[in-house]
């Protein structure tokens, strides 16, 4: 059966209050300084809202106070709105929250131009606040695109085909964010747009990690407030790309998109690739919503082990160590 993604479920605690312990068997050290307070501005669509909370909670680790924030201009259904009303604060509360750092997630794009998205003005205001306040901020995927567009007028460019899969990303600079990490690490990417590396470096951004296949992965701003930008998704669970693929092929069957999606690259085990390729051929030939029932199950189409999670945890540990050092210097 086709899985359209995990809907929001009522929970007794938000991800901000869960202690998820280790990531991929990695034990988190005790905080070096006082307990940090980190904000998560979650702009993901309803179907991924709670999952995204948990993913970033896992990477931020225990011993950190996580505060949840949302933009009023991201469209929400009633169940998601109830969750936000219970566990989240609005964008207006950011300034008085006493944050040591902020993570800003991506969002599901709807408009052809990023500046035309209904949430763009509010997101731009958050970028301005982070820049003026000096709060270290990490921007993920679409949020990274929005930030550099607002700060420096760097337009993202549409890709001929979607970058979807696990890609080897190689360090191209020395930086504390990469301390203790291998020179090349796997990173999930899932995006229809790209930031040109030349445009970033011309405006003073420093690329730290890139891929021969998908371009810039990780970069930082060299002036002003501390800002980190990710085009990839190190926070992803092992099955996230699988769920995105199932969602997109479902949209093809339902006539919501013109072409079927390509399989995520370097992601599925060989047997799963054969099963999914066979189904995609049937879907192209006999496109119909009735084919939802014939889609191979998740158990029949296993992805490879989530080899990126150790490096993802290392990146966030290094980022939080830099935040902790900044807090100690300001004390």
From Swiss-Prot:
SUPFAM superfamilies: Class I glutamine amidotransferase-like. Its EC number is 2.3.1.46. The record marks 190 as: Important for substrate specificity. The active site is at 141 (acyl-thioester intermediate), 233 (proton acceptor), 235. Its main location: cytoplasm. Keywords: Acyltransferase, Amino-acid biosynthesis, Cytoplasm, Methionine biosynthesis, Transferase. It holds the Pfam family HTS. GO terms for biological process: methionine biosynthetic process. The keyword Transit peptide does not apply. It is found in: Cytoplasm. Substrate binds at residues 162, 190, 247. Belongs to the MetA family. NCBIfam families: PRK05368.1-3 (NF003776). Transfers a succinyl group from succinyl-CoA to L-homoserine, forming succinyl-L-homoserine. This is Homoserine O-succinyltransferase. It comes from Methylorubrum extorquens (strain DSM 6343 / CIP 106787 / DM4) (Methylobacterium extorquens). The gene is metAS.
